[in-house]
Amino acid sequence: MMKILAMDTSNKALSLAILENKELLGQVTFNIKKNHSITLMPAIDFLMNSLDMKPTDLDRIAVAQGPGSYTGLRIAVATAKTLAHTLKIELVGVSSLLALVPEQVEGLVIPIMDARRNNVYAGFYQSGQAVRSEAHLPLAEVLEIAGAADQPVTFVGETAAFAEQIKAAIPQAAIQPTLPDAAAVGRLGLDLPAQSIHDFVPSYLKRVEAEENWLKNHKESSDSYIQRL
């Protein structure tokens, strides 16, 4: 039996879960505007203590690897890597978008996260399988893709800010807001192969703003940017 600590801080909500294989033992989710760096470790301690568990009881850590908030992803990934290294246990990363997809929703399911300026991080799933690559896209492009689908379409995830635009473009589309769910991260991460702790990095899908601004003012390649840093 594998005990998994799963975490998702890719968005405004912070979600933690502990599972034994796919059975949920306990979960906490905080949907408050608070820096995840302040709340993550105390929340892990609270959950572990509530289940009378010790860190050494864990076999694997599953973390929402991205996309999402740059700061949130860095906090979760750094914490997951530190715990996995210290405890000498396995580490796996799970798509933050896939973890937003509810079970048993028919047709094309499109999880979205607000990426600002009317852009979104979007995935395209059918029966839990990706039918297009996850990407950072203008909402208009996502709506164009969804509008061309010959099957029911459901938008999930961070939908509130975009509900009016979705309904205007695709009146028949279903909209189902979903919060980050660490239990889903844990279940998705159960069967994945363990990843290298040293090489594990967030999946941003988009350059950070500082890098984009630098590249606008320089003709060199993105490799040059990294070298200069």
Question: What annotation goes with each model-predicted range?
Answer:
Residues 174-229:
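Acyltransferase
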Residues 23, 35, 90-180, 209, ...:
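Surface "functional belts" at beta-alpha junctions
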Residues 14-19, 120-124, 203:
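Short beta-strand scaffold segments in enzyme catalytic cores
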Residues 1-65:
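N-terminal beta-alpha supersecondary unit
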Residues 60-91:
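DPxDG-like acidic metal-binding loop motif
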Residues 31-42, 70-74, 78, 176-180, ...:
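Residues at secondary-structure transition points
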Residues 20-24, 78-85, 127:
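A glycine- and small-aliphatic-rich helix-loop capping segment at beta-alpha/alpha-beta transitions
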